[in-house]
Amino acid sequence: MLDLKRIRTDFDTVAAKLKTRGVSEAILTSLKALDEQRRTLLVQTEELKAQRNIASAAIAQAKRQKEDASQQIADMQQLAANIKAIDAKLADIDQEITGIITVLPNTPHDSVPIGADEEDNVEIHRWGKPRQFDFDIKAHWDLGEALDILDWERGAKVTGARFLFYKNLGARLERALYNFMLDEHLKEGYQEIIPPYMVNHDSMFGTGQYPKFKEDTFELDGTNFVLIPTAEVPLTNYYRGDIIDGKELPIYFTAMSPSFRSEAGSAGRDTRGLIRLHQFHKVEMVKFAKPETSYEELEKMTANAEHILQKLKLPYRVLALCTGDMGFSAAKTYDLEVWIPAQNTYREISSCSNTEDFQARRAQIRYRDEADGKVKLLHTLNGSGLAVGRTVAAILENYQNEDGSVTIPEVLRPYMGGLEVIKPR
């Protein structure tokens, strides 16, 4: 959530930055007007409360002196009625302000490229060269079915579209991948967490999913619970409402969890395969950092995600997302896209973001600065390390052989009992 004081004192800068994210200046002008009206009413109510206190003292003195206090009592009753009326106006204005400011996206960092959509993202670098095949390649869904390791037909029967069963060596490959990913992150100083897979609405608000993106989630009717769309939500909210000792920062968390997404608005997109599912595994990275080091931490986090792809020897590229393509809470985002041969393109497999103090303000996550003892908002970061199902898709396609078998990447073989190849059954 943006700082209302910043909007008030640096309106033009905030308006210019949010314009690059598609926010009309008229919305901010309306917000500023409401804020000014609120501040005026607060001054009025404080003045009235001071008058009420004076009237109350005058009534008490009159009663002690056994004098007629009926006029003072009438005056105080009128003051109380006026205060009540202003408080009601303030409540309405506060609700309007909340309704606007909670759906405004974060302001982009100065280094973020300005653009309207994914076409304006900027490629930073590439790693690895896409393999040149001398045979007709198959898509990962065809490979998975032929190898008897992925079953979409029964997933659709048991649940519905965009669900599947991993089976046999497919289940083992998925498990090998997320264990490998977690082990690599632990080497980089991350603490492993197994979080709840359901969170409450306050947690969804804290990380920015609510109220704006409610339609993208699965809520449990009759409860305050939501199935997590990403482990970012429980991991970040771990410190919601807390004040952390500044000496403990930065703090690194990692977790593997299922992610549940309704994929509202994705009808007709990626209807086959592992790219877009309602339920999928993802290894998440979350960091809590001081403002002065958060962008250094973003570079490190992105490098951690790249390291996984490099160890798996999967070609990828890194993009700096433009202002129009970044997520709601992000101030800066790098996307990692892995090469998918059957689609002859790169597809997103990780997104690493610095939200600065945007989530911390919503969730009230603060730290006590050891230098001056003051309590301040920290910066939160999050990134995929990696999306496991998409990594399975990339391995199946990049490591496929002419006979329909798939070679296991060397780094995963210890996690698969030394198995080197998945062969058709």
Swiss-Prot record:
Sorted alphabetically, which InterPro entries does this protein's record hold? aa-tRNA-synt_IIb, aa-tRNA-synth_II, aa-tRNA-synth_II/BPL/LPL, Ser-tRNA-ligase_type_1, Ser-tRNA-synth_1_N, SerRS_1_N_sf, SerRS_core, tRNA-bd_arm
One Pfam family assigned to this protein is tRNA-synt_2b
Catalytic reaction annotation: tRNA(Ser) + L-serine + ATP = L-seryl-tRNA(Ser) + AMP + diphosphate + H(+); tRNA(Sec) + L-serine + ATP = L-seryl-tRNA(Sec) + AMP + diphosphate + H(+)
| Main location class | cytoplasm
Which cell locations does it reside in? Cytoplasm
State whether keyword Signal applies.
no
Q: Which residues bind ATP?
A: R261, S262, E263, E348, I349, S350, S351
UniProt-listed SUPFAM superfamilies: Class II aaRS and biotin synthetases (SSF55681), tRNA-binding arm (SSF46589)
Q: Which domain of life, per UniProt?
A: Bacteria
Keyword set for this entry? Aminoacyl-tRNA synthetase, ATP-binding, Cytoplasm, Ligase, Nucleotide-binding, Protein biosynthesis
Looking up Gene3D superfamilies in the UniProt record yields: Bira Bifunctional Protein, Domain 2, Serine-tRNA synthetase, tRNA binding domain
Top enzyme class: ligase
Q: In which pathway does it act?
A: Aminoacyl-tRNA biosynthesis; selenocysteinyl-tRNA(Sec) biosynthesis; L-seryl-tRNA(Sec) from L-serine and tRNA(Sec): step 1/1
Q: Which GO terms describe its molecular function?
A: ATP binding; catalytic activity, acting on a protein; serine-tRNA ligase activity; transferase activity
| A biological-process GO annotation | seryl-tRNA aminoacylation
Task: Respond yes or no to whether keyword Ribonucleoprotein is given for this record.
Answer: no
Residues annotated for L-serine binding in this entry: T230, A231, E232, E284, S384
Identify the GO cellular component terms for this protein. Answer: cytoplasm
List the EC numbers from the record: 6.1.1.11
Family listed: Belongs to the class-II aminoacyl-tRNA synthetase family. Type-1 seryl-tRNA synthetase subfamily.
- What's noted about domains in the record? Consists of two distinct domains, a catalytic core and a N-terminal extension that is involved in tRNA binding.
Tell me, in a sentence or two, what this protein's role is.
Answer: Catalyzes the attachment of serine to tRNA(Ser). Is also able to aminoacylate tRNA(Sec) with serine, to form the misacylated tRNA L-seryl-tRNA(Sec), which will be further converted into selenocysteinyl-tRNA(Sec).
Database matches in PANTHER family: SERINE--TRNA LIGASE, SERYL-TRNA SYNTHETASE
Quaternary assembly: Homodimer. The tRNA molecule binds across the dimer.
Name of the protein in its database record: Serine--tRNA ligase
What is the gene name? serS
